[in-house]
């Protein structure tokens, strides 16, 4: 607001007028409607909150009689209207402003200064008011120094500063309350009541606020102590507890009485009084709170201060001022009680973890075990428990163990299905996984790879005297190739057939069953590995050896049936062979020879070791019928394709026995 050339009044002078001459003092609040309802000076009025009235006032449309009537009609504290009154105008805090601007609205900050200037000019000319004064510092400074002389309108109160009370800024009607013979609790209004302080012989005051003024009856600074804290959830009041306790103890030894107060006497000052009771009367935080609550029911410290009282209780226990049994919550002190006393472990409810926890393998008397010791268990009631245990032991049959025996024998749970308190639950015995079967891991060396699989191969052929030795196979596992004997002097294609051990030579007319997995011959001088679709083997035409899968029997074939023993090929490729010269030598008497494997054009770069094509056998009529799709080559004729295939590079694997 702008500085006016008129009489000003201080905050102390206005407080004196309100107390001493409220009937002849008219206080006008020139602020807005919202600010007035939040807080204003006691018995003040807000007559010009309407925009219409303000506009008419600025335009000089209100005469003096209407203006005075407007003020008198809104006044509630001034009762002596016939006498001359003292008029006090106030607004917000006085702030210097620059160039004046045009007032945009009546609620702008400049409107309050303009209202005060217009009212002063209009009311000075009347003889109704003895003086027109302006409050120095505005309402903010007055509210800081004299909060007890400020009030709020109903329905527009401030938000509470504590969750435990609707509004802590409003003083209660408890007055000054006696807590101990030398300690009183009160509010800011009580600290300014000199008559009451003199009647109670109170000469020492502790003020827990930052704005409340010092009591006028306290002349010496040694009898006054200020603790600058606010009633909020961030303030720390506990650091002042020891200093306040020493100050109160000094007053008690001197025989003086002390008043502890804050703004309303609800949160801050009761917290300090509770801390003193805790140390002086050796009570826990809960007991001290009830002690003060019984004498002053309006107290309600906020949650921040209540938590600091619990922390102060722990400090007193560590300093051996309070005993563990006197604490409000004894289980919070970990130094005195073991972990098993505070929170016993629970038995898992999951079916997969019923047997996860192992039994206790440590001694129960071990200092590292968190189980309940005999000394701590002795502090609990033992009469009923011992009587119950003795009766249960006596009533139990001899075959059944007692409760204590069952609890001792079981390392996991007791008879009630709960986890045994005596088991050791150290970190090494905690379950690391569920009770599932473990899978054996495979090392890196055991993982299959081309290098490891190739190292397992052996290039040594099977021996003739050990037919049960596993046969080496270099072909694709989808095409199991047999190993058959060959002879260099024969060009006839003969297929050895496995037959059962009990079969005879007379059963050659039946259709044979082929098994390409185990073909072997004792008279073979060379081992040939071939693909069954591209295998053409040279064997003596005079005889052949048919081996059973077990290798126990062989059936020789006659030399005269060499032409009939030729196998007709069935499948996808033709068979090209040369007529073998007549020979009477047996495979046993033939000289060792080699067999050549022709590599077809489509498999020359695949790296598969093959021999001449050997296909499945077809029936005689299928080979001779025109519907078979091919004609049998004449004996003695040589196909050009066969020559070209046989002339290709081959691979020989000799085997020396």
Curated annotation (Swiss-Prot):
Entries under Pfam families matching the protein: DSPc, Rhodanese
Amino acid composition bias (Polar residues), ranges on this chain: 406-419
Alphabetical keyword list: Hydrolase, Protein phosphatase
Xref: CDD domains: DSP_MapKP, DSP_MKP_classIII
Catalytic activity: O-phospho-L-tyrosyl-[protein] + H2O = L-tyrosyl-[protein] + phosphate
Region (Disordered): 353-426, 539-563, 581-657
Boundaries of every Rhodanese domain copy: 21-151
Tissue specificity note: Expressed in the pharynx, intestine, neurons and vulval hypodermal cells.
Subunit structure: May interact with pmk-3.
Job description of the protein: Acts preferentially on the c-Jun N-terminal kinase (JNK) and p38 MAPKs. Plays an important role in the heavy metal stress response and in axon regeneration by negatively regulating the kgb-1 (JNK-like) and the pmk-1 (p38-type) MAPK signaling pathways.
Name of the protein described by the UniProt record: Tyrosine-protein phosphatase vhp-1
Chain's gene name: vhp-1
């Amino acid at each position: 607001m702008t500085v006016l050339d008129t009489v000003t009044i201080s905050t102390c002078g206005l407080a004196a007028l309100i107390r001493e001459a409220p009937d002849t003092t008219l206080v006008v609040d020139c602020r807005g409607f919202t600010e007035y309802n939040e807080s204003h000076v006691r018995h003040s009025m807000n007559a010009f909150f309407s925009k219409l009235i303000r506009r008419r006032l600025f335009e000089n449309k209100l005469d003096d009689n209407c203006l005075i009537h407007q003020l008198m009609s809104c006044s509630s504290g001034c009762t002596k209207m016939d006498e001359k009154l003292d008029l006090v105008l106030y607004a917000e805090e006085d702030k210097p402003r620059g160039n004046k601007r045009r007032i945009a609205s009546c609620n702008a900050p400049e409107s309050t200064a303009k209202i005060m200037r217009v009212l002063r000019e209009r009311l000075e000319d009347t003889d109704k008011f003895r003086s027109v004064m302006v409050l120095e510092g505005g309402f903010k400074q007055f509210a800081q120094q004299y909060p007890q002389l400020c009030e709020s309108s109903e329905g527009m109160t401030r938000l509470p500063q504590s969750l435990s009370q609707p509004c802590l800024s409003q003083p209660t009607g408890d007055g000054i309350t006696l807590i101990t013979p030398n300690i009183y609790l009160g509010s800011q209004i009580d600290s300014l009541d000199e008559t009451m302080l003199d009647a109670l012989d109170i000469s020492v005051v502790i003020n827990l606020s930052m704005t409340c003024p010092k009591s006028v009856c306290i002349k010496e600074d040694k009898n006054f102590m200020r603790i600058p804290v606010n009633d909020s959830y961030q303030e720390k009041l506990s650091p002042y507890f020891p200093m306040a306790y020493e100050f109160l103890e000094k007053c008690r030894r001197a025989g003086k009485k002390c008043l502890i107060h804050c703004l309303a006497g609800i949160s801050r000052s009761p917290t300090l009084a509770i801390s003193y009771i805790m140390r002086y009367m050796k009570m826990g935080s809960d007991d001290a709170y009830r002690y003060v609550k019984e004498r002053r029911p309006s107290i309600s410290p906020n949650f921040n201060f209540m938590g600091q009282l619990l922390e102060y209780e722990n400090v007193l226990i560590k300093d051996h001022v309070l005993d563990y049994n006197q604490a409000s919550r004894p289980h919070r002190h970990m130094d005195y009680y073991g972990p098993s006393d505070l929170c016993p472990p629970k038995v898992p409810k999951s079916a997969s973890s019923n047997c996860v926890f192992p039994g206790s393998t440590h001694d129960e008397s071990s200092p590292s075990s968190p189980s309940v010791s005999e000394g701590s268990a002795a502090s609990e009631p033992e009469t009923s428990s011992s009587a119950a245990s003795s009766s249960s032991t006596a009533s139990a049959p001899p075959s059944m163990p007692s409760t204590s025996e069952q609890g001792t024998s079981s390392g996991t749970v007791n008879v009630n299905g709960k986890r045994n308190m005596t088991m050791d639950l150290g970190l090494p015995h905690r379950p690391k996984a569920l009770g599932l079967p473990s899978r054996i891991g495979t090392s890196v060396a055991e993982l299959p790879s081309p290098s490891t699989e190739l190292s397992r191969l052996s290039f040594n052929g099977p021996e003739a005297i050990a037919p049960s030795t596993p046969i080496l196979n270099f072909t694709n596992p989808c095409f199991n190739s047999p190993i058959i004997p060959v002879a260099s002097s024969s060009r006839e294609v003969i297929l050895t057939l496995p037959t059962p051990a009990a079969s005879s030579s007379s059963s050659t007319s039946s259709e044979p069953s082929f098994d390409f997995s185990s073909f072997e011959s004792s008279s073979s001088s060379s081992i040939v590995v071939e693909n069954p679709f591209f295998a053409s083997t040279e064997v003596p035409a005079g005889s052949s050896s048919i081996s059973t899968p077990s290798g126990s029997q062989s059936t020789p074939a006659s030399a005269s049936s060499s032409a009939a023993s030729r196998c007709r090929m069935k499948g996808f490729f033709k068979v090209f062979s040369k007529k073998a010269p007549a020979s009477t030598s047996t495979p046993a008497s033939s000289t060792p020879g080699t067999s050549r494997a022709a590599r077809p054009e489509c498999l020359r770069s695949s790296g598969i070791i093959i021999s001449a094509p050997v296909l499945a056998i077809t029936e005689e009529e299928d080979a001779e019928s025109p519907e078979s799709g091919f004609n049998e080559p004449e004996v003695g004729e040589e196909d050009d394709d066969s020559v070209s295939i046989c002339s290709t590079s081959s691979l020989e694997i000799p085997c020396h026995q």
